[in-house]
Regions:
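An acidic, glycine-rich "communication" segment
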Residues: 1-2, 10, 92-185
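Short, Lys/Arg-enriched charge-dense amphipathic segments
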Residues: 17-20, 24, 37, 55-62, ...
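Hydrophobic/aromatic beta-strand patches that form the interior of the parallel beta-sheet core
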Residues: 86, 170-173, 207-209
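Extracellular ligand-binding/catalytic regions of CAZymes and related secreted enzymes
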Residues: 1-9, 13-15, 35, 43, ...
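Short C-terminal domain-edge/linker segments immediately following a structured domain
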Residues: 34-38, 82-86, 117-121, 236-242
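Helical hinge/lid and interdomain linker segments adjacent to catalytic or ligand-binding clefts
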Residues: 3-6, 10, 14-105, 110
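Conserved beta-strand segments of alpha/beta enzyme cores
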Residues: 29-31, 114, 168-169, 205
Length: 242
C-alpha cells in the first residue's frame, strides 16, 4: 500500500518537511505545495490521500498565511469527497487572528476547532517529560489512531475551543494543567481541555493536534514514547485503512 500525502507550504507553515519514517511494509509518497506555488485548488489535491498543514505561523497583517475563500471551498470539496486533512498547530496557536481574516479557524466546519489558543500548555507533575511544555500523555481515549498506543509526547502544545457537534476528543490535558498566555506571559489553570481531536466531514476525515514539534523535535519528537506508531495510525485512519 502506498499512502500519498501532499504537504502545504504556501501559508507560512513551520513544518516544511514531512517526517521521513518507516511505515511497516507500506510506502509514503510525499509531494509539496511550495511556498510560492499556491493557491490550493481541488485539482491539486484530488489525487492525494492526505493534505497536511503543519503549524501555520499566523500574522495580524500579512496575507501569505491566510486562506482565501476559494482555497477553503477547494479544501472542503477535497475532504468532503473522501480526502484526509491532517492539521497541526503549536505554541501560540492561531495568534488570536480572527476567522474573518482567513486564519486556520476557517477550517472549523471540517476540523471542529473554532480556536487555537495563543500560548503554550504547562503540564502538571507526572504529566510532562523533563520540561512542563513537553506534554506527556498516558491516557488516551479509544479510537483507531490510539490503538496500541500507551504514551504520546507533544512538545510546545496549545489547546482548542471546539464545536459541540461532529468532533471527538482523543487526547486531553490533565486536570491540573496550566497555560502560559503569549499576549502577557501570564500563566493560569485550564484544567481538562482538548489537544487532539478527530472529525468526519461528509465522506472525509480530519485529525487536528495542538502540537507540531512532536514531528520534528530531536529529543521529544518521533523517537519519544509511541509517537511513531501514533503517526502511523493517523495516516492509516485518514486514508480509510482502519
Amino acid at each position: 500500500m502506498t499512502y500519498n500525502i501532499i504537504v502545504d507550504l504556501s501559508h507560512k507553515e513551520k513544518i516544511e518537511e514531512f517526517p521521513d519514517f518507516t511505515l511497516g511494509d507500506d510506502d509514503l509518497e510525499v509531494d509539496y505545495i511550495d511556498k510560492n506555488e499556491g493557491p490550493i485548488d481541488y485539482d491539486l489535491l484530488e489525487d492525494y490521500d492526505i493534505l497536511f498543514i503543519g503549524n501555520v505561523q499566523q500574522t495580524k497583517d500579512g496575507k501569505g498565511d491566510k486562506f482565501t475563500k476559494d482555497e477553503l471551498l477547494s479544501i472542503k470539496r477535497y475532504v468532503g469527497d473522501g480526502g484526509g486533512l491532517f492539521l497541526t498547530s503549536g505554541g501560540g496557536g492561531d495568534r488570536d487572528v480572527p476567522m474573518k481574516l482567513g486564519s486556520i479557524r476557517v477550517l472549523y466546519k471540517m476540523t471542529g476547532v473554532r480556536r487555537f489558543w495563543n500560548g503554550s500548555i504547562q503540564e502538571s507533575h507526572s504529566h510532562f517529560l523533563v520540561d512542563k511544555q513537553n506534554v506527556l500523555v498516558t491516557e488516551l481515549f479509544n479510537h483507531p489512531i490510539t490503538e496500541g498506543i500507551t504514551q504520546v509526547v507533544l512538545p510546545n502544545c496549545t489547546f482548542f475551543t471546539i464545536t459541540e457537534e461532529d468532533v471527538e476528543d482523543i487526547i486531553v490535558t490533565s486536570a491540573k494543567a496550566d497555560f502560559k498566555y503569549s499576549i502577557d506571559n501570564d500563566t493560569g489553570g485550564i484544567g481538562v481541555v482538548p489537544i487532539c481531536v478527530v472529525s468526519e466531514f461528509f465522506s472525509g476525515r480530519c485529525v487536528t493536534i495542538g502540537s507540531s514539534d512532536w514531528l520534528i523535535e530531536d529529543d521529544f519528537g518521533l523517537d519519544a514514547g509511541d509517537n511513531i506508531s501514533f503517526l502511523s495510525n493517523i495516516i492509516k485512519w485518514l486514508s480509510f485503512e482502519t
